Curated annotation (Swiss-Prot):
UniProt-annotated binding residues for uracil: 192, 197-199
Cofactor descriptive note: Binds 1 Mg(2+) ion per subunit. The magnesium is bound as Mg-PRPP.
Cofactor needs: Mg(2+)
Lineage, uppermost ranks: Bacteria, Bacillati, Actinomycetota, Actinomycetes, Mycobacteriales
Protein name: Uracil phosphoribosyltransferase
Binding site for 5-phospho-alpha-D-ribose 1-diphosphate: 77, 102, 129-137, 198
EC number(s) on file: 2.4.2.9
GO biological process per UniProt: UMP salvage; uracil salvage
Protein family per UniProt: Belongs to the UPRTase family.
Amino acid sequence: MDITIVNHPLVASRLTLLRDERSDNAAFRAAANDLGAMLIYEASRDLEVEHFDTKTPVAMAEGTRLKQPPIIVPIIRAGLGMIDPALSMIPDAQVGFIGLARDEETHEPVPYLEALPQDLSNQPVFLVDPMLATGGSLLHAIRLLADRGATDITAICMVSAQPGVDALAESGLPVRLVTATIDPGLDENAYIVPGLGDAGDRLYGPRNIDL
């Protein structure tokens, strides 16, 4: 599996703000928005482009555009925080949705929503979720995408844990990973250590319903 860890001073500074327990919801969202855009930028590096003629106020020039913009697929709830930065970088991208909640006892994903194109063959997919912990949710989502024909899937995560990275690598699924960091492990509740806490709660406040 191809893994890209984005090593950049601005990435590190935003990651620090996300980790800091003093960052309130607004500060966390702002840092996540910045970091999300940086990760999308890096993930887009190898997308196919096409060239065309464009006219400047002075002369003709060669223009460049994406040949096929990716579909952005957030894993709800926390992945919603990565839609705006993704669309700011790729405004003509489509957006799909996968809803997964975590069972706090088993730590397994519980699906509750799937809104995706029926056919994803020959379509680049950016699967976005701030956290890659055990890998359970991401693997469930990747299998849904693969079942619809996706073979070009990029998982974009702000913080990844080594056990989740290992699970992805061992799955044999068609995925590459772009992340800001790989943390060493998980605690007894399957939270990333040192991590940044519950990304969904820190983006939007505590969830007050059970799914």
